[in-house]
């Protein structure tokens, strides 16, 4: 009873804090709060409080259930929300690169945790005895690595999607013109020609407009570079987690079912997801095709992760259907 009350308290604390952080962060898009010293640092600390709240929630559930809390959909979603908090903390303590990961990690954490605690999963929060197939020391290693991999890959893919949105918005309708580079050069030459033939007063105004336009484009360029920087590194980390998770799952499957690979629906989609992100990493090694192309591949991977994560759960089929919507 005490553990159940403590779990509810920690759930409400973590959910409330991340909700407040998300609300305030998006308010900063409408109101300029840059002058408030330490404001954004306080938002980051809010995510850290959420991290400790979810950590306490997982440990509490681990203690009174007697097993690692990754046996059903509710627990895996809470763990996934915890993974997003970790990603945010890693970027927070890395002061060398400015980033905007809280715009990705905070909404992801609140939506995932909100879905986990919603009425759709009202039967899931009750911890139950593990089925025989899950009573193994491989449960902690395999499932935790897979969900950490999902979290990192989802975060990196969302950054790639943001990169695509900013890039296409920057280019605009002229993106598909073949002579876009020529038009750009002509516009630049024309702008500087005008500077020589207008009076001094108008010249100053025009120079200010050009400076403002250049600063705006330079900021977008920096933002795109930051998104690409963090997307590549987070996806690389997630790919490592996913690879080790699949390998540990193969060893566990051999001990449980007598075969390393059974082409179960979950295994098949995990392999497809792994292949897509392997292609992404391969594209990043080629300077001629990386950039938008790699971001498009990561966007496809974003959809595949959700198919891999929820596909078996929604259908309730295969060897990985434990804790699904249809299973009891």
From Swiss-Prot:
It is a multi-pass membrane protein. InterPro entries: Cyt_c_assembly, Cyt_c_biogenesis_CcsA, Cyt_c_biogenesis_CcsA/CcmC. GO terms for cellular component: chloroplast thylakoid membrane; plasma membrane. Keywords: Chloroplast, Cytochrome c-type biogenesis, Membrane, Plastid, Thylakoid, Transmembrane, Transmembrane helix. One of its GO terms (biological process) is cytochrome complex assembly. Coiled coil: none annotated. It is found in: Plastid, Chloroplast thylakoid membrane. Pfam families: Cytochrom_C_asm (PF01578). The keyword Plastid applies. GO terms for molecular function: heme binding. The chain crosses the membrane at residues 13-33, 46-66, 73-93, 101-121, 146-166, 234-254, 263-283, 295-315. The keyword Transmembrane applies. May interact with Ccs1. Belongs to the CcmF/CycK/Ccl1/NrfE/CcsA family. Required during biogenesis of c-type cytochromes (cytochrome c6 and cytochrome f) at the step of heme attachment. This is Cytochrome c biogenesis protein CcsA. The lineage of its organism: Eukaryota, Viridiplantae, Streptophyta, Embryophyta, Tracheophyta. The gene is ccsA.
